[in-house]
Amino acid sequence: HSGATITLVPMDATTQTLLTHQDLTRLTACDHPLPQFVRETLRPWIDYSIRTRHLPGCWIHDALVIAWLLNQRVADGVDYHDDIELRPGATRGKTWRYRTPLRLDVGVPADAGALVHVMQNVNNPLLLEVIEQTFNGLKR
C-alpha cells in the first residue's frame, strides 16, 4: 500500500529461463573480471542443475529480474489486484490476486489490494542477449 510500482517475478516466470554451458561460454567470453567470476561461479551450478533437475542448463532467476530492469522487452506480464490476507485466522498470510472485473463474490472487496504487474512470459533468447551485451560493454 506504499504506492510504489511493483512487479512480481514468480517462479513460474523464472523457470522459463535457461542458461547452458554453451551460453555461459559465449556470454562470458570478454576479458573482464566480472564475466570471469560469473563463469567460474555458474559452471558448477549448471552441472548441479543438469544432474538434479535433468535440465540442459540452469535457471537464472536473479539475472532475469536485473535484465528486465535494463530492457522490459525481456518479459511481459499482466496487471492484477494483489494483497496479503492480514485478518486473524487460518488464512492469515495467504496471498491472493484477481483481475478486474471480478465476476463473482470471493469475499474480497472490489478494488482491494494494490495493482501489481505479474511477469508471465519470458523471452529467453533476448534475456541472454541483454546479459551478453551488458558484459561486452564493461570497461577494464
Describe each region flagged by the PLM.
Residues G3-R140:
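Conformational coupling and interaction surfaces
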